[in-house]
């Protein structure tokens, strides 16, 4: 009969020897299977004609209108425009910032995305980049995009409320209202009168991708623009500081155009007289009024609530 000798099992070590732990700690991280493609911006000299053109487009509304282009700054807003399908002509990068960031940074990422979309990528020195930037603390990326405006008659035919900005002068408010309008499901935003340029640098920063996803219309004259909206079957609703009805007590579920006036003076008496309803946001305490962008957002989201519940 066969005999089987017992096998001696060594106890399992709970701790590796010190040399083994040190060896493991010093092991280099494994290389990624697919390293990101390295895209290097093409340097431009300070005398390149593109630089002077960028300065004009960044600083002058007339130049943007003539060129049909606008400027957007910052890697994150530019990435949002790319994702929204915006037509970017060129991308400019601060070479100093470029050299200081790694492949996971938003700056490197947006350059890769732009290059993949066939957008030329140019590099500028820090001083030249600062001279074309509209911000005090440039974020290292600036792009040139197509300025697309939709006719008021086309915006009027789209389902959803239309936001009409009359003589809105602050670009930050304008951009914030564009973004709020998209979030609230508006058909589009119409800028009339002496309103700021919706494609100015500050307005674009506030609106981000909404500036290309949402139809934007412009009209220099207020009355013809309102007539166009009214003839399409839309009811005009004015927001006023006092004397109006609370937003929740006003029917905003149908085909409406909501008017917001200038930060300093609101809507004129003539414009208010052409509207079929007026809205006043109830406020407590001694506060007389709130920011135009805040007021607009309150009314827009009340309209969205009513449409959901209709």
Spell out what each predicted region is:
Residues 43, 70, 166-167, 190-193, ...:
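Glycine- and other small-residue-rich loops at beta-strand/loop junctions that grip anionic moieties
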Residues 143, 180-184, 198-211, 269-310:
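Structured adenosyl-cofactor binding patch, chiefly the S-adenosyl-L-methionine
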